[in-house]
Amino acid sequence: MERIGGQVKDQEELAKQVLSWITCAKRPLTTSELQHALAVEVGESALDEENLPQIEDIVSVCAGLVAVDKESNIIRLVHYTTKEYFERTQNHWFPNAETDITAICVTYLSFHAFESGFCQTDAEFEERLRLNQLYDYIAHNWGNHAREALTLCQQVIGFLESELKIEAASQALLAIKRYSGHSKYSQEL
């Protein structure tokens, strides 16, 4: 962490965001999910793709603490003891991580892309997933992050007041993969 702290401010901040997301994530994140998480600007109504950090930059600023699995495209801490360390010392290194992640999650779910509510077809839903890489993770886990947050952020209230955005998030919870390991989804219950 000394090496991370010795970087220029923007790189140090990026490294801490990466490490907090990887430490606090409720399941392993893909590189594209993490890129989207890092690119969200709280309070904005759309993702600015110019904010997507390059994977090489993400790995570099973390000073050897993270690695990308080439087969699964999962970004993770290099060793399980590193994860255990950050989980144990989370309040020291990332004291507001769950609050910050909650704000990012709810901002993402409040994007204009979800204002249409429930997708009418499987193809439309799959396209929504493809275009919004973090959507599935956030729809399933934003509530868990909110429950662990130190404070309730204003974005949660705004999100909960939008029936169509709630519908869109709920759809991701209800949709199931047709076949294990297959990218096709079905909305049939």
Which residues are covered by each model-predicted region?
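Leucine/isoleucine-rich amphipathic helices and adjacent mixed helix/strand linkers
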Residues: 1-189
